[in-house]
Amino acid sequence: MDFSHRAVDLGGDPAKKLTLCYIGGMVRMERVSDYVLRPLAQDKALAVGNLAGAIGRIRDGALYNLSVEERTTMDEAVFDLIGGNCLLLFPGESVCLSFNTGTEEKRSVSEPENEPPLKGPRDSFVESIRTNTSLVRRRLRAPELKVRQHVVGRQSLTPAMVVYLDGIADPDTVKRVEEKLDAIDIDGVESAGNLEEYLTDASRTPFPLMP
């Protein structure tokens, strides 16, 4: 089993036990140990008051070395867990906290192999969707640039981003794309080609079209 969980004494108080969950191989254990477990156990101020107060202090930056998000649904929590985050569960509370502790093992940005450019930038998209969206934002710094995340695949839970310029992209087209993404009902997405089959029309043209 690669799923792991362990008890944490909040602020060193055995009466306030929390549960930390993560998937082995998906997290950097030194980050979990140094930036989550140790501060939670050693910061005695976190044990003062009730758990709701501790949640607020942790969410607002008590563990300042990590980004933290509050999750209120099981789908959000599971999505973060399989993405390399660790989850901190509080007994009797309906929320959990998600910490970014991923391994961050990914291919570096490099020149495209299939379509090498003759002029201009020589960086290409990689397997990390966050890296790809950051590449777009570096090249297109307009405040109108919008990035919306959708999740496709019942089993793979693959993130897919809709990126467009607000005020320039046709709102109806953006809406149709998002509706089609949300309507895709498959187990998993292996490549962008899988999405293209569901998003484009079957008209006789060499170019993919939105119906």
State the predicted function of each range:
Residues 1-211:
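Cytosolic regulatory modules rich in charged/polar residues
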